[in-house]
């Protein structure tokens, strides 16, 4: 960080983080990345469940570390009067309280939204749960796969002749985490005008449903749920994964101009004037035969040749990379998307803001109650 750079736009912000597992900690990690002081309040015992999740490096859980590095850790038993008083003092000074318990848990602990407002009228109280704090499913337990199953996203993921599959990453958790971050940021901005706090209520179900895009559009337009399409796009073609002589590549043509350029690169210019392929709508209708024409040509040479040739004419094209290959890309390095936190390689901050530091090294994830003595002393009165 240079002398002219800040730690981030949230430098000086105090966040009390009661979130656990993935959904909530992902959202508060974004706040931490942007300069906020995040104090993770963990229960007695083993703390956040993910401390016990693999994989491990040097005895540390990577699962926990990926979404909790740079945060402080204190263990508080909120059923204990002394610990509860420390927690209340923390709340009095905090800007944000984040949690992802089932609805009703904070009330049982004595910290309803009404009580929190009395303690600190400017507090942003952010809740994230499977189905939110309202509606008939609000008390239902949820993990990522439950939400993927119920939101419709699993039913539209995969191939038409195969069963539905879970999206490869924990999409519902991560969608919820991103919206948790966005909700907190929005509420903080609103506080600048109102001078009062707010309750942010995020549901993983809502978040995932809002990401459905094609699925929702198709249903609204036709009254029917869409079929699974594999790697194809419902409204654009060619927009798929194609086999070459040695490796698959992905090609995306979103308009007639790109399709014409692709045909030029593949020396298939006769396809441009073929009435079956003269528009996106027609190419989608006839994409099976179109894919045969394209793959027949692609299979004559190696992927490397086609990647260069197609890229040269300005058509979006890419190899299918493994994680190991993706993290070694010069682009990954140039964007500082791999950093070191506590001696362990971690994902970098995807939010780049001018004038704010984008460090290559961050503090690692704290051990359980690592900052307990310091925090108890700081907030003892």
UniProtKB/Swiss-Prot annotation:
The active site is at 233. Keywords: Transferase. GO terms for molecular function: acetyl-CoA:oxalate CoA-transferase; CoA-transferase activity; protein homodimerization activity. Its EC number is 2.8.3.19. Induction: By the acid response regulator EvgA. The keyword Endoplasmic reticulum does not apply. Pfam families: CoA_transf_3. It catalyses: oxalate + acetyl-CoA = oxalyl-CoA + acetate. Gene3D superfamilies: Crotonobetainyl-coa:carnitine coa-transferase, domain 1, formyl-coa transferase, domain 3. Homodimer. Involved in the catabolism of oxalate and in the adapatation to low pH. ACOCT serves to prime the oxalate-induced acid tolerance response (ATR) cycle by producing substrate for oxalyl-CoA decarboxylase (OXC) and formyl-coenzyme A transferase (FCOCT). Catalyzes the reversible conversion of acetyl-CoA and oxalate to oxalyl-CoA and acetate. It can also use formyl-CoA and oxalate to produce oxalyl-CoA and formate with significantly reduced specific activity. Belongs to the CoA-transferase III family. NCBIfam families: PRK11430.1. This is Acetyl-CoA:oxalate CoA-transferase. It comes from Escherichia coli (strain K12). The lineage of its organism: Bacteria, Pseudomonadati, Pseudomonadota, Gammaproteobacteria, Enterobacterales. The gene is yfdE.
